[in-house]
């Protein structure tokens, strides 16, 4: 099985959203897609949180480059 990536998960989540919005799935099919979508959304959120934790802003202070943790505004 291929390694799951943020991009592939987001793409699959968008496809699931379109399928659910179409109204053409059975109740059982909709529930399965909904469950899969929740799992994909959680994975994407975890990936974003991990990326946010790694983001650093380089700031110049006293002629030296200093790494500063990213702070969301």
Swiss-Prot record:
<keyword id="KW-0378">Hydrolase</keyword>
<dbReference type="GO" id="GO:0005829">
    <property type="term" value="C:cytosol"/>
</dbReference>
<dbReference type="GO" id="GO:0009318">
    <property type="term" value="C:exodeoxyribonuclease VII complex"/>
</dbReference>
<comment type="similarity">
    <text>Belongs to the XseB family.</text>
</comment>
<keyword id="KW-0269">Exonuclease</keyword>
<protein>
    <recommendedName>
        <fullName>Exodeoxyribonuclease 7 small subunit</fullName>
        <ecNumber>3.1.11.6</ecNumber>
    </recommendedName>
</protein>
<dbReference type="Pfam" id="PF02609">
    <property type="entry name" value="Exonuc_VII_S"/>
</dbReference>
<comment type="subunit">
    <text>Heterooligomer composed of large and small subunits.</text>
</comment>
<dbReference type="InterPro" id="IPR003761">
    <property type="entry name" value="Exonuc_VII_S"/>
</dbReference>
<dbReference type="InterPro" id="IPR037004">
    <property type="entry name" value="Exonuc_VII_ssu_sf"/>
</dbReference>
<dbReference type="GO" id="GO:0006308">
    <property type="term" value="P:DNA catabolic process"/>
</dbReference>
<comment type="function">
    <text>Bidirectionally degrades single-stranded DNA into large acid-insoluble oligonucleotides, which are then degraded further into small acid-soluble oligonucleotides.</text>
</comment>
<keyword id="KW-0963">Cytoplasm</keyword>
<dbReference type="GO" id="GO:0008855">
    <property type="term" value="F:exodeoxyribonuclease VII activity"/>
</dbReference>
<keyword id="KW-0540">Nuclease</keyword>
């Amino acid at each position: 099985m291929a390694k799951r990536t943020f991009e592939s998960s987001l793409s699959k989540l968008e496809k699931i959203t379109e399928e659910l919005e179409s109204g053409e799935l059975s109740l059982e099919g909709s529930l399965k897609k909904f469950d899969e979508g929740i799992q994909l959304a959680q994975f994407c959120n975890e990936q974003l949180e991990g990326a946010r934790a790694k983001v650093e802003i380089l700031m110049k202070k006293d002629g030296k480059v200093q790494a500063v943790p990213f702070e969301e505004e």
